[in-house]
Structures are given as structure tokens and as C-alpha cells.
């Protein structure tokens, strides 16, 4: 007979049936704390993507922000891998994934190839922050049947023209004074002001940015999106969407959140108090609770 130490069965059920929404229940089997874990590289058109896969259950994919990588989601993977199959990736040009080549590519097609290669048959939940939001929204528009739900945190979208957030200044710095100088310049951007208030968060953030190659700052990026751009197609998104902003994030990302909420019929908008652009890292417990409630109850 299995004991509590070597076998546990956890069933998550919601009593209010009328609130059952995306994931009505999840059952997790754990054996001596063991969970499935694998990592590697998936070939994509003219490149390869690094991924880590943890846990078991309905699939969830995490999409990081610009100049960052899969490490920004560690506190989410640690939590959600208890209930879901967590696929955490480095988008092309970032982290351990290959740099762009001369051929055009798109994030959403890269994600499609990766999911197919991992034999992910059922629709996925895409959890994304900042630049990752572009990838998530484009994927949901290109492959609606493979999209279960979206979580868009301080997200960017194709077709939006920023007013307070200018990456060209960082590119100019990299080209004129070098990538290392540009990294220090970027770390002082207003989007990271709130993260600086937490030493451990900023240390992790700084580590990722200092390891960034700087490729996008020095080269013309052959990435392509959708036509027309996503901002003109938001009403076509039928999947449920959770929109999250950090209270202290800059105006542009607050504006994008309003645009998303006003144009996506099945969307819910939440704000995390005392958090900035990196809300999932600054307030991981609050972020995880909001996402978990959304996936279980749709709220």
C-alpha cells in the first residue's frame, strides 16, 4: 500500500459549477516529489529554440520579455508545474536559442513548430510578458484552434507605437558606445524602476540583461508579424484572455492593456499593486494567484 510519503493524490475541484471555465479540475499524481522534467533544442526554420518542459497536465507555454529569457518565469514554473505541463522557452535571438539569420522568421511560427515537435496536441495556455505578448497574440490569431487561453502581462502588441518607451535610444547607444554600455543604459530605463526596489528581483533581472547578446541592437531584425498587424485584429480573438498590469508600469503598457480589454470580448483586466513592468517577478505570489484563479474559474 502506498504511504503519504511516496504517493499523494491532489484533486483540485471547484464547487460552484457555474464558474467552471477553462480548467474545470486538475488531478496531480506525485511520487516521492518526482515530476517530469526535460530540456533541449527544437529545430526551427534557419535556427533552433531552447526549451524546458516540467510537470504534467494541460499545456502552458511561457513567453519572456525583450532582452530577457526563460529564467524570468522560474517562480511561475515552480508553482504551475504542480498542475500543468509547463513549457518555458527562449524566443529566437534570446537566451540559449539561436540568433536570427538572414531569412525572415516569426515568433508565432517558431512557437507552432516547437509545439508540434513536442507533440502538444491539445490547445495551450500562453502566458506572456512585454515582448512575449506580441508572440502570444499573434499565435492566437494565426492558430485560434490551438489557443486555450492567453495571459498577457504588461504586454506589447504589433502595431502599437510607443510614446514613452524608446528602444532606438538603446540601439544607438550600443552602436556608438558598445553593447556593454547599452546594457547599463537599458537597466536604468523607467520600466525597471520598480524592480530596483527589490534587491533580489533586480539582481535576477540584471543577470539576464547582462547575458543578453545585444544582437537586436546591432542588426536589422528580419522578424515578421501578421498582416494587418495584431492591433487591427484583436476583435477576432475568441479565447479567454487575462490582462495584467503592474500598477507602477509606464503609461504605454497601461494604454495597451486598455486597448486589449476594450477590443477582446472575452477578457478580464487585473492590476497588481505596488508592482511595475516585471510584475511576475516583483509580486510572484499575487501573479500566480491571479493566473490560477483565471485558469480555474475564469475570473
PLM features: what roles do these ranges have?
Residues 250-256:
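Conserved alpha/beta-hydrolase "acid-adjacent" motif
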Residues 267-299:
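Catalytic active-site module of serine/aspartate enzymes centered on a nucleophile-bearing elbow/loop
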Residues 2-60, 83-84, 292, 296-299:
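Alpha/beta-hydrolase fold catalytic core
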Residues 45, 87-127, 131, 289:
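Active-site loop/oxyanion-hole signature of alpha/beta-hydrolase fold enzymes
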Residues 137-142, 148-178:
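Flexible "cap/lid" loop of the alpha/beta hydrolase fold
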